[in-house]
Amino acid sequence: MLSRSQDKTMTKPISPLLPIAYSKEVASAKQRGAPLVALESTIITHGMPYPGNIEMARSVEAIIREQGAVPATIAVIHGTLHIGLEAAELEQLAKATEVMKVSRADLAFAIAERRTGATTVAATMIAAARAGIRVFATGGIGGVHRGAEESFDISADLEELARTGVIVVCAGAKAILDIPKTLEVLETRGVPVVTYESEEFPAFWSRSSGIRSPLSLNSPAAIANFQTVREQLGIDGGMLVANPVPEADEIASEEMEIYIERALDSAERDEVTGKAVTPYLLSTIFDLTDGQSLKTNIALVENNARLAAEIAVALGE
């Protein structure tokens, strides 16, 4: 059970009914005008097992600090929206077993019912924007699931990218998804998709999906400038920055496709649906790859955190 930490700086609620708490580090950064990078918490609670999840979370936060920015891991704890977690809270969240996975549809529910919830990409974007944080680092976004023409399973992440003005740095859409359809939805919704230092859109564990990226840029400063001009033009919505996993850590896309197909077949046999699909597939792929998928996942998250911090610093220059 997560304890109620007293080591927090309570701030004026975003609205009269919404309790929000900034960690001391984040509150200090906001006061100084220091660059901030938002981090989701679902990757901690639903993405990998303990203690690997807490080690990854600490490493990612340290990487952001090394680049001159401040990490802000976002979660709902006992109905309070936390922007930044103290060390003890991060540890407790990593060990917790009964944590909601909250998106746009149920973020308010978790707060209203005083639940504890880990934020998805969509929920983290909402919280980051409310807190004035312009950059967010994650592993991979959700998107259009394979077979969506029958299941209609499409992640709320795509709609959030069209609505909320946050730069999301990721390693592309998760490769378990239908990447071409995911990119089509993003194009339809007017979301700019920029691949960093590559002409090809990445596929999470693999550096290339075989699909040409809509846009590409080669420096954090160029990405920051692009977003600044969008804001000056009054263009709503976020930007997706796809950062290919380091070459030394990737799993070839041809090899990954074999594992993904096996995992999808298993999910169909077990009749897995809804929010349970992605965690199930990731867990199955972990087993099929003898843990290599998790090692690659950690490497790409760390790589994304580094780029996100560089972009956040560039936005402040």
Curated annotation (Swiss-Prot):
Q: Which UniProt keywords apply?
A: Glycosidase, Hydrolase, Lyase, Manganese, Metal-binding
Q: Which residues form the active site?
A: 40 (proton donor), 174 (nucleophile)
The entry's Mn(2+)-binding residues are: 153
InterPro entries (UniProt xref): Indigdn_synthA-like, PsuG
* Entry GO MF terms: hydrolase activity, acting on glycosyl bonds; metal ion binding; pseudouridylate synthase activity
Q: Supply the EC number(s).
A: 4.2.1.70
Q: Which residues form a coiled coil?
A: none
Q: Which reaction does it catalyse?
A: D-ribose 5-phosphate + uracil = psi-UMP + H2O
Q: Name one GO biological process term.
A: nucleobase catabolic process
Disulphide connectivity of cysteines: none
Task: Give the cofactors, semicolon-separated.
Answer: Mn(2+)
Does the record bear Ribosomal protein in its keywords? no
As to how many cofactors bind and how, the note says:
Binds 1 Mn(2+) ion per subunit.
Domain of life, per UniProt, equals: Bacteria
- List positions binding substrate: 101, 121, 155-157
What job does this protein perform? Answer: Catalyzes the reversible cleavage of pseudouridine 5'-phosphate (PsiMP) to ribose 5-phosphate and uracil. Functions biologically in the cleavage direction, as part of a pseudouridine degradation pathway.
State the oligomer form and interacting partners. Homotrimer.
- What family does this belong to? Belongs to the pseudouridine-5'-phosphate glycosidase family.
Which PANTHER family does its entry note?
A: CARBOHYDRATE KINASE PFKB DOMAIN-CONTAINING PROTEIN (PTHR42909:SF1), ZGC:136858 (PTHR42909)
Its name, as the record gives it, is: Pseudouridine-5'-phosphate glycosidase 1
Species this protein is from: Rhizobium johnstonii (strain DSM 114642 / LMG 32736 / 3841) (Rhizobium leguminosarum bv. viciae)
Upper taxonomic classification of the species? Bacteria, Pseudomonadati, Pseudomonadota, Alphaproteobacteria, Hyphomicrobiales
